[in-house]
Swiss-Prot record:
Name listed for the protein in its UniProt record: HIG1 domain family member 1A, mitochondrial
Subunit architecture: Associates with cytochrome c oxidase (COX, complex IV); proposed complex component. Also associates with respiratory chain supercomplexes.
One GO term describing the cellular component: nucleus
This protein's UniProt keywords: Acetylation, Electron transport, Membrane, Mitochondrion, Mitochondrion inner membrane, Phosphoprotein, Respiratory chain, Stress response, Transmembrane, Transmembrane helix, Transport
Membrane-crossing residue ranges in chain numbering: 28-48, 69-89
Purpose of the protein: Proposed subunit of cytochrome c oxidase (COX, complex IV), which is the terminal component of the mitochondrial respiratory chain that catalyzes the reduction of oxygen to water. May play a role in the assembly of respiratory supercomplexes.
Induction (free text): By hypoxia.
Entry-annotated residues carrying N-acetylserine: S2
Name of the encoding gene: Higd1a
InterPro entries: Hypoxia_induced_domain (IPR007667), RCF1 (IPR050355)
Length: 95
């Protein structure tokens, strides 16, 4: 039984930074969704001190819903953008 140790796959050759940059160019709304999620969570944690009479669980639920809503919105915009590019901006010729 022989083992082939010199497999060279392009996905294993690129580093984490270059892989993230390549993926960000392919799907630009994913990093936007990640950044928005992080920003909403950071803002929610910052406002945790001055939440007033609101229970902590309610505040955290509102923060989670806002962050998830932002991510779903970014995903929807990303799908719309990719559909626009594939079907309207650069349509493939019919055979």
């Amino acid at each position: 039984m022989s083992t082939n140790t010199d497999l060279s796959l392009s996905s294993y050759d690129e580093g984490q930074g270059s892989k993230f940059i390549r993926k960000a160019k392919e799907t630009p709304f994913v990093p936007i969704g990640m950044a928005g999620f992080a920003a909403i969570v950071a803002y929610g944690l910052y406002k945790l001190k001055s939440r007033g009479n609101t229970k902590m669980s309610i505040h955290l639920i509102h923060m989670r819903v806002a962050a998830q809503g932002f991510v779903v919105g970014a995903m929807t915009l990303g799908m719309g953008y990719s559909m626009y590019q594939e079907f309207w901006a650069n349509p493939k010729p019919k055979p």
